[in-house]
């Protein structure tokens, strides 16, 4: 599946990886795709042309236009449809004459595909030998399929995020402001907000573990007095810390967005805090947070 331009064949992923689901592409590649396709020009096909090739209807495309990152939303929506794959995406980009995209992103797409294959092989190798008929001690993989609004119900193409947001219901207004500042601006980050993105009907502990460990690159903790009383937030925080002891991978980012009467949680004191309450640094708050969440 080579592009038409000179040298494009070496940039596009090889056929052995192009049949992979779109979930193989990480957020970095998706954001760079958005940089190419979100721009409306007269000389190059943009995301709307891609949406039409993906068989999206007029009203669906108009709805996607309302998002700050229509290309990102398009990919999220398309990956749950039959026939969506890395290879099909490259075919459509070639058909639209976007050889520039293939040349620029081909190596990164190939790298993502190879990482996806390696991870699948590792997970398969680590599976314990168990008899399905009698094994009831661990949850089935299918139980964690279709847990978010844009998930493939069969679990083949799970929805992925830049960050999981750990918060209490009483802090939802600040979370909504976070959505406006990080998703609906040029940062174009994708946040996992339970009340918005998670479907009801599954064990909250299983969902949180799946999302934090496998679907989200980082976790933002909205710290408040109410947070200290939440067993769910306590579990999510400790689980995230267990995945990155000593915070060496910068996986967890605490946020203090209002004054607290109670003492700041001791398990988070060794991690640099984003302090929204400090008037001297408030103007830098969203930029610092966005850059922290955008790190590879």
Swiss-Prot record:
The keyword Ubl conjugation applies. Adapter protein involved in the Toll-like receptor and IL-1 receptor signaling pathway in the innate immune response. Acts via IRAK1, IRAK2, IRF7 and TRAF6, leading to NF-kappa-B activation, cytokine secretion and the inflammatory response. Increases IL-8 transcription. Involved in IL-18-mediated signaling pathway. Activates IRF1 resulting in its rapid migration into the nucleus to mediate an efficient induction of IFN-beta, NOS2/INOS, and IL12A genes. The intermediate domain (ID) is required for the phosphorylation and activation of IRAK. This is Myeloid differentiation primary response protein MyD88. Pfam families: Death, TIR_2. It comes from Gorilla gorilla gorilla (Western lowland gorilla). It is found in: Cytoplasm; Nucleus. Its main location: cytoplasm.
